[in-house]
Amino acid sequence: MRFAPDYVLCPPTATRRLRATHPSVSTIYFLFTIFVVSTVFHCHQRLALVPAPWAYSARVVVVPGHLPREGMWTINAMGRLGNQMGEYATLYALAKENGRPAYIPAQMHSTLAPIFRISLPVLHSSTASRVPWQNYHLNDWMEERYRHIPVPYVRLTGYPCSWTFYHHLRHEILREFTLHDHVREEAQAFLRGLRVNGSRPSTFVGVHVRRGDYVRVMPQVWKGVVADRGYLEQALDWFRAPTAPPVFVVTSNGMAWCRENIDASRGDVVFAGNGLEGSPAKDFALLTQCNHTVMTIGTFGFWAAYLTGGDTVYLANYTAPDSPFHLVFKPEAAFLPEWVGITANMGRALWSGL
């Protein structure tokens, strides 16, 4: 028995006609490009995308067809790094306390994710616009009523900056604010290269000096002061020991002032920070890889001390008794009980024009 062949020969004229109607390679490439661009565009409309290159470091929220029954909690992303760390930790703790899932704004993710291994999912603006949020204002410290917020879709507001919100979850907060390996390793490599009078130090004290806008805001708005030369002398002397002298690693958003006002004649002070407020990762990592902390004022220094552990010295009583700052700030809720406060010299600091 004979079988028909698997192919049919075409006459030359038919072959030429087929070639004439077959699309060219450039046409196929163009159509494929249009298909890919269209697919990406439609996916972008449906998914809550996060700006590169850190999109992989957190779960991304898809716009829901129906709002989840368990609710959704988020928080306003206000301020720079220290403020947003406080907001993140507060959202993490209060949402857990109230049994609600927590989501962070994309803006907060862009600030924190390049530095830390945060885990909360990201709430894109396209999702946020579909949620019937109820704003819930927080004071700067924890209150009992925050443990029972009977609202499913909450947007927390304010500038919470107190350990009283989350200290009972300290280990979880430290895990959330674990540095990325490359950030930590760069800081550790810098510290390993430091020498005190020719010897490698065994103890590092991170020093953060807040200057910048606070130089104007504290006296003009809050009837207060920033750290002066006298405070920093006392704070560094508190850590100096004759047997195992530490090295002081100074960071600040006013490095020129620090070089003029911090005595480095003993050879144990290193002016290490770059002072760039827009890219704080290097300075923050250096502080957290030290053993102890000298802070002045502000949330950046607080978080450096909180993550570092060890001993912390801070500037205390830096506002006048009638300062409006006392309406929004409680020192006992801002500084851990075991930290050591050195009282600011209000008179000398105000006269010096700081």
Curated annotation (Swiss-Prot):
The chain crosses the membrane at residues 23-43. The keyword Plastid does not apply. Disulfide bonds: none annotated. GO terms for biological process: carbohydrate metabolic process; fucosylation; glycolipid metabolic process; protein glycosylation; regulation of cell adhesion; regulation of endothelial cell proliferation. Pathway: Protein modification; protein glycosylation. One of its GO terms (molecular function) is alpha-(1,2)-fucosyltransferase activity. GO terms for cellular component: Golgi cisterna membrane. Residues 1-22 are cytoplasmic. Its EC number is 2.4.1.69, 2.4.1.344. It is found in: Golgi apparatus, Golgi stack membrane. Keywords: Glycoprotein, Glycosyltransferase, Golgi apparatus, Lipid metabolism, Membrane, Signal-anchor, Transferase, Transmembrane, Transmembrane helix. Salivary and lactating mammary glands. It is a single-pass type II membrane protein. It holds the Pfam family Glyco_transf_11. It catalyses: a beta-D-galactosyl-(1->3)-N-acetyl-beta-D-glucosaminyl derivative + GDP-beta-L-fucose = an alpha-L-Fuc-(1->2)-beta-D-Gal-(1->3)-beta-D-GlcNAc derivative + GDP + H(+); a beta-D-galactosyl-(1->4)-N-acetyl-beta-D-glucosaminyl derivative + GDP-beta-L-fucose = an alpha-L-Fuc-(1->2)-beta-D-Gal-(1->4)-beta-D-GlcNAc derivative + GDP + H(+); a neolactoside nLc4Cer + GDP-beta-L-fucose = a neolactoside IV(2)-alpha-Fuc-nLc4Cer + GDP + H(+); a neolactoside nLc4Cer(d18:1(4E)) + GDP-beta-L-fucose = a neolactoside IV(2)-alpha-Fuc-nLc4Cer(d18:1(4E)) + GDP + H(+). Belongs to the glycosyltransferase 11 family. PANTHER family: GALACTOSIDE 2-ALPHA-L-FUCOSYLTRANSFERASE SEC1, GALACTOSIDE 2-L-FUCOSYLTRANSFERASE. There are three genes (Fut1, Fut2 and Fut3) which encode galactoside 2-L-fucosyltransferase in rabbit. They are expressed in a tissue-specific manner. Catalyzes the transfer of L-fucose, from a guanosine diphosphate-beta-L-fucose, to the terminal galactose on both O- and N-linked glycans chains of cell surface glycoproteins and glycolipids and the resulting epitope regulates several processes such as cell-cell interaction including host-microbe interaction, cell surface expression and cell proliferation. Preferentially fucosylates gangliosides GA1 and GM1 in the antrum, cecum and colon and in the female reproductive organs. This is Galactoside alpha-(1,2)-fucosyltransferase 2. It comes from Oryctolagus cuniculus (Rabbit). The lineage of its organism: Eukaryota, Metazoa, Chordata, Craniata, Vertebrata.
